[in-house]
């Protein structure tokens, strides 16, 4: 569960290290974002000579949340951190690698490129 002003880790090699959530997309009064939702974020930390710079405003898709996520079969999944992947306006990842596991719910939200790059889908 991500809301405005949440700090997230970045799970790709776009060069950003920390993101600061500015807005949750999808409705004028939407408060929270879960796995597979898109947010607008500011880059708080970045590596030198990277594709994104500190202070850039980017879009990101949430791939892991520390708040547990209920599945239709009654099971729950929860991760150790809140992480996102920086995406462009065509909903494709800016980086070429994804680090760590991602949730299966991304498949239903049509983020197939992220699913294929991820080392593990839980």
From Swiss-Prot:
Keywords, comma-separated and alphabetical: Ribonucleoprotein, Ribosomal protein, RNA-binding, rRNA-binding
Molecular function via GO: large ribosomal subunit rRNA binding; structural constituent of ribosome
Gene Ontology CC annotation, any one: cytosolic large ribosomal subunit
SUPFAM superfamilies linked: Ribosomal protein L14
Disulfide pattern: none
Keyword rRNA-binding found: yes
GO terms for biological process, alphabetical: translation
UniProt xrefs under CDD domains: Ribosomal_uL14
InterPro entries, alphabetized: Ribosomal_uL14, Ribosomal_uL14_bac-type, Ribosomal_uL14_CS, Ribosomal_uL14_sf
Family per record: Belongs to the universal ribosomal protein uL14 family.
Role, per record: Binds to 23S rRNA. Forms part of two intersubunit bridges in the 70S ribosome.
HAMAP family (UniProt xref): Ribosomal_uL14 (MF_01367)
Subunit relationships: Part of the 50S ribosomal subunit. Forms a cluster with proteins L3 and L19. In the 70S ribosome, L14 and L19 interact and together make contacts with the 16S rRNA in bridges B5 and B8.
Name of the protein: Large ribosomal subunit protein uL14
Gene: rplN
């Amino acid at each position: 569960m991500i809301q405005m002003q949440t700090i997230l880790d970045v799970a790709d090699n776009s060069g950003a290290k920390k993101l600061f959530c500015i807005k949750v997309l999808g409705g004028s009064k939407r408060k929270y974002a879960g796995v597979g939702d898109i947010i607008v974020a500011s880059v708080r930390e970045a590596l030198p000579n990277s594709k994104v710079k500190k202070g850039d405003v980017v879009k990101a898709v949430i791939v892991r949340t520390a708040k547990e996520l209920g599945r239709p079969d009654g099971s729950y999944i929860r991760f150790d951190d809140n992480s996102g992947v920086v995406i462009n306006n065509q909903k494709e990842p800016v980086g070429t690698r994804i680090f760590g596991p991602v949730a299966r719910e991304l498949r239903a939200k049509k983020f197939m490129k992220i699913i294929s790059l991820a080392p593990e889908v839980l």
